[in-house]
């Protein structure tokens, strides 16, 4: 369960970084 939550957080951060990078 914790791993899933952590994975979602990581994906969210990556998506935000991609948007900012663009």
Curated annotation (Swiss-Prot):
**Subcellular location(s) of the protein:** Mitochondrion inner membrane; Mitochondrion
Q: Would you identify the family this protein belongs to, as annotated?
A: Belongs to the MICOS complex subunit Mic60 family.
Indicate what this protein is called per its UniProt record: MICOS complex subunit MIC60
Corresponding gene? IMMT
Q: Which domain of life is it from?
A: Eukaryota
Which keywords, in A-to-Z order, does the entry hold? Answer: Membrane, Mitochondrion, Mitochondrion inner membrane
GO CC terms for this protein?
mitochondrial inner membrane
This molecule's function is given as: Component of the MICOS complex, a large protein complex of the mitochondrial inner membrane that plays crucial roles in the maintenance of crista junctions, inner membrane architecture, and formation of contact sites to the outer membrane. Plays an important role in the maintenance of the MICOS complex stability and the mitochondrial cristae morphology.
Species, as recorded: Mesocricetus auratus
Self-association and partners: Component of the mitochondrial contact site and cristae organizing system (MICOS) complex, composed of at least MICOS10/MIC10, CHCHD3/MIC19, CHCHD6/MIC25, APOOL/MIC27, IMMT/MIC60, APOO/MIC23/MIC26 and MICOS13/MIC13. This complex was also known under the names MINOS or MitOS complex. The MICOS complex associates with mitochondrial outer membrane proteins SAMM50, MTX1 and MTX2 (together described as components of the mitochondrial outer membrane sorting assembly machinery (SAM) complex) and DNAJC11, mitochondrial inner membrane protein TMEM11 and with HSPA9.
